[in-house]
Design a protein with these regions (language model features):
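Bacterial N-terminal signal peptides
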Residues: 1-10, 14
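Short, composition-biased motifs enriched in small/polar/acidic residues
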Residues: 14-98
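Acidic glycine-/aspartate-rich tracts in secreted/extracellular proteins
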Residues: 39-42, 51-55, 114-116, 143, ...
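A short glycine-rich, aromatic-capped structural motif
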Residues: 95-157, 170-173, 258-259, 325
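Short, well-ordered surface patches within globular domains
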Residues: 109, 162-228, 264, 270
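Short, well-ordered junction/capping motifs at the entry into regular secondary structure
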Residues: 231-258, 279, 306-310
């Protein structure tokens, strides 16, 4: 972060949802760290942002959420607006997020691959710093045929129905509809943080989770000789999709983040800042992670599979979900 960092401590032992903080407009590069302490031992805390303290609910945007039982405090970097005051408030829910969802804190990472990484593609560079400014949850598994069929009423997969195989041949549009229905279902069950939703991960969120704090070609290191311990690919998959969770997860607990089926990402495929893209149509979506039929180079953390239209149906294509703020709603 550029500029001075000042900590604003937010003590919330009782009046959860009542505390609020105001940041006045500023032209400086100052960054404040909003620190929340003394939270209950269970449940989920959500931090909201608005330009009007008296605004109604729909004018407050959820910018960060975290399981309060995991931390005694949570620091969130925030920047004042150049034009309007920024108000922050806290809410808390006594809920348990589904156990298959892993919470990831805000953080910075290097996205993309360096010029010297073997078998890299031109759209993977240049390496650039990315800030994930919100906590979010990501599914430790790819969505299975069982989960997809139960919610959607059909199974587009190329295989016979098998409960623990990842669903494949899913279009981006269908994956989005799955997320919409899952949001409605878990909202009704009161297991979803307020202001958050199920959706596809952005490319940045996906690579952040895949890398798990590493800068190597794969989440476990650089050696292709170890890939078969971590992902299903051309040399160990017998040419077929494998059950989820059968190999070693990455350091943050995500299974099949390398290989098995490709995973749709939410945002539109574009060149990185200062980089080159294979398509500039502005309508294409992107797969990540590689698949069971792919060579090792496609399973690298930085690899961006060829862009496709949202209605594209591919035998290698699946997805996993995140619980996160609506795309574009976080602070950046």
């Amino acid at each position: 972060m550029i500029g001075l960092c000042t900590t604003l401590v937010w003590l919330c032992p009782e009046a959860l949802g009542q505390a609020s903080i105001q940041l006045s407009p500023s032209d400086s590069n100052n960054t404040f760290s909003l620190s929340v302490t003394e939270l209950p031992a269970t449940g989920v805390a959500v931090i909201w942002r608005s330009t009007n303290l008296l605004a109604k609910g729909e004018h407050w945007s959820a910018v960060h959420a975290f399981p309060s039982g995991k931390q005694t405090k949570s620091d969130l970097p925030v920047r004042p607006s150049k034009t309007d005051s920024a108000f922050f408030k806290l809410s808390w829910q006594n809920i348990i997020v589904p156990e298959n969802m892993i919470w990831l804190p805000p953080g910075d990472f290097k996205m993309g691959s360096p010029d010297g990484e073997p078998k890299r593609y031109k759209d993977e560079g240049p390496v650039h710093s990315v800030t994930i400014d919100h906590g979010f949850w990501m599914d430790r598994y790819e969505v299975t045929q069982e989960r997809f069929t139960a919610l959607m009423g059909n199974n587009p997969s190329s295989t016979e129905y098998t409960t623990d195989l990842p669903v494949n041949r899913v279009t981006w549009d269908e994956a989005r509809e799955f997320c919409k229905r899952l949001t409605e279902l878990d909202s009704a069950r009161n297991t979803l943080p307020l202001g958050y939703q199920y959706r596809l991960p952005t490319e940045a969120e996906w690579e952040y989770a895949c890398r798990a704090g590493t800068n190597s070609a794969y989440s476990y290191g650089d050696k292709t000789s170890q890939l078969s311990q971590h992902g299903w690919w051309a040399e160990n998959s017998r040419g077929q999709i494998e059950q989820v969770g059968g190999l070693t997860p990455n350091p943050w607990g995500f299974y099949d983040i390398h290989g098995n089926v490709f995973e749709w990402c939410l945002d539109t495929y574009r060149a990185y800042p200062g980089g080159t893209a294979y398509s500039d149509s502005g309508t294409m979506k992107i797969f990540r992670g590689g698949a069971y039929y792919c060579p090792s180079s496609i399973l690298r953390s930085a690899c961006r599979a060829e862009p496709q239209k949202p209605d594209y149906r591919w035998v290698l294509g699946g997805f996993r979900v995140v619980i996160a703020p609506p795309h574009g709603q976080a602070q950046n």
